Amino acid sequence: MMVSPPQEDTVFNTDSDPVYEQATDDMTFNDTTTDGNGQESVPLEALTVVEIEKTSKGFGFNIVGGTDNPHFVGDIGIYVSSVNSESKSYGVVRTGDKILSFDGIDMTYKTHDEAVEVFRSVKIGHVAKMLIDREYLHLQEDRTQTPTASVSITPQVTPQTRSTQNNTDTPKSMSHSESKSRLTSHGLSAVIERIRGKVYEEEDAQSVTSYAPSTHSIIDDVPRTPRKPLSLLDPRNNSWLTEALYVSIGLGALTISGYLAYRFIRGRR
């Protein structure tokens, strides 16, 4: 499975460098990863690969977070906020799971809308592999949670899909040994370091600047009202027409003032 770096324009573009190396069956893995100082970080046992299927009702769980809408202060990750008990994801995905990658797409540096689009782009019936950190939520207990808007990974309900479907053959979580053969050593280290906050300074500079809840969701896809254009007389309008208009008004006022002064002086003689 490929774990690609974050993309800005498209979530499926993996052409830019660098890309992490391809996992092979003969790769060996350590039980723990190390940070830049050589100290042990999170063990691989904290990571879990699960398989989830998209049905006509979606994946059956909601997500929160993102670079523009962090769920925790200083944490830009994507989290599972709730799971539908009648969905196939129930028992496989849990509330509080942190999504690290989805079908090889790095989810650790996505905006909220980019993460939603990744899930929406999957076709019905597709079984996706999702790498999650199930123990990371315990590290956030002392952090202050900020208000966020939960987005449902479920399409809009129509009269044809209102009937309750019986879910069978629920996908099971993959074992730790099985997940090791599908994940890259370098890819996991990069994802974990990003999760733990050991990111580069340039990524910190691009970190979130607003903790406002996202107003965009799958089931509430209402476009925002466009901003009213500024008039030519509005001082906030920086167009050359506005500047020319104000210069003309100023020159006209000076001309009229000069003419009136001339008539006044001439009349007194």
From Swiss-Prot:
Residues 143-185 are annotated as: Disordered. Signal peptide: none annotated. Disruption phenotype: RNAi-mediated knockdown in young adults results in an increased adult lifespan. At 37 degrees Celsius, levels of reactive oxygen species are reduced compared to wild-type animals. Double knockout with atad-3 RNAi results in an enhanced increase in adult lifespan as compared to the single mutants and wild-type animals. The chain crosses the membrane at residues 240-262. It comes from the Eukaryota. It is found in: Membrane. Keywords: Membrane, Transmembrane, Transmembrane helix. Residues 145-174 have a biased composition (Polar residues). Residues 49-121 form the PDZ domain. This is Mitochondrial scaffolding protein 1. The gene is mics-1.
